[in-house]
Amino acid sequence: MLVGVTGHRPERLGTNWPVVERWIGDKINEYKKTGESVSLITGMARGVDQIAARVAVKKGVGVHCYFPFKHNMTDFEKSIVERAETTRFEYDKYVPQCYIDRDRRIVDDCDVLLVVWDGVKTGGTYYTYKYALDNGKKVEVLQIPVAGSDLNDRRI
């Protein structure tokens, strides 16, 4: 089972990191219980993508890193790529559509998409979520409040 992930960057997560980390870990455990092999597809952006990558490595789950374009990697990115089953770059350099194309590839390649979303209907997380729904993908959502408020674990 290929599990894609999308969600907000740190600025929109606020103090919700621990709940996000726990939820992703719980979902990975749930999928592992089916007996299927489980791997995570992450876009490796700061925030939810990197939280998910770290959780997957801790849980012994394969990781597929889908970067929007080639760049100088951070130490964290290098540490995940070293363990990754695959690493791909949508483009050799930045182009305006690189993030959208990377996000669509994650959706196209995954069996289920985990979405950490604050409910605001703009931005990359929302458009990736909508693309998944429009293309009949199974989607699981952890709705978080807008950054700065407390997290109530609400599902949409």
Where are these regions (language model features)?
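Acidic/glycine-enriched connector segments
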Residues: 1-154
